[in-house]
Swiss-Prot record:
<feature type="domain" description="KRAB">
    <location>
        <begin position="24"/>
        <end position="95"/>
    </location>
</feature>
<dbReference type="InterPro" id="IPR036236">
    <property type="entry name" value="Znf_C2H2_sf"/>
</dbReference>
<feature type="zinc finger region" description="C2H2-type 6">
    <location>
        <begin position="344"/>
        <end position="366"/>
    </location>
</feature>
<dbReference type="Pfam" id="PF13465">
    <property type="entry name" value="zf-H2C2_2"/>
</dbReference>
<keyword id="KW-0862">Zinc</keyword>
<comment type="similarity">
    <text>Belongs to the krueppel C2H2-type zinc-finger protein family.</text>
</comment>
<dbReference type="InterPro" id="IPR001909">
    <property type="entry name" value="KRAB"/>
</dbReference>
<feature type="zinc finger region" description="C2H2-type 3">
    <location>
        <begin position="260"/>
        <end position="282"/>
    </location>
</feature>
<feature type="zinc finger region" description="C2H2-type 7">
    <location>
        <begin position="372"/>
        <end position="394"/>
    </location>
</feature>
<keyword id="KW-0238">DNA-binding</keyword>
<keyword id="KW-0539">Nucleus</keyword>
<dbReference type="InterPro" id="IPR036051">
    <property type="entry name" value="KRAB_dom_sf"/>
</dbReference>
<feature type="cross-link" description="Glycyl lysine isopeptide (Lys-Gly) (interchain with G-Cter in SUMO2)">
    <location>
        <position position="194"/>
    </location>
</feature>
<feature type="zinc finger region" description="C2H2-type 9">
    <location>
        <begin position="428"/>
        <end position="450"/>
    </location>
</feature>
<keyword id="KW-0804">Transcription</keyword>
<dbReference type="InterPro" id="IPR013087">
    <property type="entry name" value="Znf_C2H2_type"/>
</dbReference>
<dbReference type="GO" id="GO:0000978">
    <property type="term" value="F:RNA polymerase II cis-regulatory region sequence-specific DNA binding"/>
</dbReference>
Length: 462
């Protein structure tokens, strides 16, 4: 059977007729020269010849095509020159000076000029090939699809494209175009590569959260997040992690190791991501930009917090009074008005506050400096807002107006407290008896009743 096939090919070569459609063999796509032609090639062309022949050989092996004669490949791998090249393909110049490829046996030729990439080339067996210089799509089993220009290295050293380049590009393109469907059916080719051949992008979707990945390995790595498996355990505190890298980062908390150092200010960090975030302070980089107003932020969390201003969304709701807030920290601060929690203590006088900002404002009292002075009465203030609020007393200006009753106020706080009369809102609740109030001072006064009752009860018990 094999002898018959080889005999048929030899007959086709001698007659110059095209082979019937069937399985492609290595000699169908081999680029061959006579001994004289081989000697006329410069070292760069010979190196290109070896690369092209070996690449075509690998492509055919991948396709599972029978390769009966491997002697020429063996010589090429050893970088030895082929002994006798039976087929003859000449690169000659025609009458008008343009280069062309000519088969000695058949007499067929094709002009290789500026428009050669748009003309068909026929080799000595009659195979029609599309000649062009675009990058070729090649495939190898078990590896990703990659782009490879068969003559990239050669073109880097030559200013013009040689006829040999045009032939090699054409043959390889022919393999891909003709055997595209065979590639799709090839059992060892991964699904994403088959999809690429069809001209489609292949995607792996996580069934848990719908996130999409182009590579299966990325999906597998991502899915660890959803699994309960956390094989990496900290021997100090017992905390477990899904990845070893997370355990390594966590371990630095116990060791105090901070291997990442800022070259600007010498500050050290236990994570590279923290260092990168810190360095934006020095560079002024603000990569996270708001599409609505153009304001930029150093961190993504800053942008997320800012975006709520544009949407008007207030997702954080107080379970006590039903009031909504844009930010979680605002809700946390508000909830202390119901619980009477005051975690911030002044080290000077021991007074406690529910908010850090209140403590900061209070601590100014202990400092002697009051740089903001009223020109009318000489009263001085620690901060400019205090002076501005004070000046309204002298001017009589009351810029804050109630939309319900048109009453005006000198401070926004007074307006806010007043508006609760119209809304009926009473956000301040006594934990002892459940009574509610519309202003915090009213609640404070009320609590003294319970404090007095407790004192009286204590005296009676004594």
């Amino acid at each position: 059977m094999l002898c018959d096939e080889e005999a048929q090919k030899r007959k086709a070569k001698e007659s110059g007729m095209a082979l019937p459609q069937g399985r492609l063999t290595f000699m169908d796509v081999a680029i061959e020269f006579s001994q004289e032609e081989w000697k006329s090639l410069d070292p760069g062309q010979r190196a290109l010849y070896r690369d092209v022949m070996l690449e075509n050989y690998r492509n055919l092996v991948f396709l599972g095509i029978c390769l009966p004669d491997l002697s020429i490949i063996s010589m090429l791998k050893q970088r030895r020159e082929p002994l006798i090249l039976q087929s003859q393909v000449k690169i000659v110049k025609n009458t008008d000076g343009r280069e062309c490829v000519r088969s000695v046996n058949t007499g067929r030729s094709c002009v290789l000029g500026s428009n050669a990439e748009n003309k068909p080339i026929k080799n000595q067996l009659g195979l029609t090939l599309e000649a062009h210089l675009s990058e070729l799509q090649l495939f190898q089993a078990g590896r990703k699809i990659y782009r490879s220009n068969q003559v990239e290295k050669f073109t880097n050293h030559r200013s013009s494209v040689s006829p040999l380049q045009k032939i090699s590009s054409s043959f390889t393109t022919h393999i891909f175009n003709k055997y595209r469907n065979d590639l799709i059916d090839f059992p060892l080719l991964p699904q994403e590569e088959k999809a690429y051949i069809r001209g489609k992008s292949y995607e792996y979707e996580c069934s848990e959260d719908g996130e999409v990945f182009r590579v299966r390995a990325s999906l597998t790595n991502h899915q660890v997040i959803h699994t309960a498996e956390k094989p990496y355990k900290c021997t100090e505190c017992g905390k477990v992690f899904s990845r070893n890298s997370h355990l390594v980062e966590h371990w630095r908390i116990h060791t105090g190791q901070k291997p990442y150092k800022c070259s600007e200010c010498d500050k050290v960090f236990n994570r590279n991501s923290n260092l990168a975030r810190h360095q934006r302070i020095h560079t002024g980089e603000k990569p996270h930009k708001c599409n609505e107003c153009g304001k930029a932020f150093r961190e993504c969390s800053g942008l997320t917090t800012h975006l709520v201003i544009h949407t008007g969304e207030k997702p954080y709701k107080c379970n006590e009074c039903g009031k909504n807030f844009r930010h979680k920290f605002s809700l946390t601060n508000h909830q202390r008005s119901h619980t009477a929690e005051k975690p911030y203590k002044c080290n000077e006088c021991g007074k406690v506050f529910s908010l850090l900002s209140y403590l900061a404002r209070h601590q100014i009292i202990h400092s002697t400096e009051k740089p903001y002075k009223c020109n009318e009465c000489g009263r001085a203030f620690h901060k400019r807002p205090g002076l501005m609020a004070h000046l309204l007393i002298h001017t009589g200006e009351k810029p804050y107006k109630c939309n319900e009753c048109d009453k005006v106020f000198g401070r926004k706080l007074y307006l806010t407290n007043h508006q609760r009369i119209h809304t009926g809102e009473r956000p301040y609740k006594c934990n002892a008896c459940g009574k509610v109030f519309n202003q915090n001072p009213h609640l404070s006064r009320h609590r003294k009743i319970h404090a007095g009752e407790n004192s009286l009860r204590t005296l009676q018990m004594e």
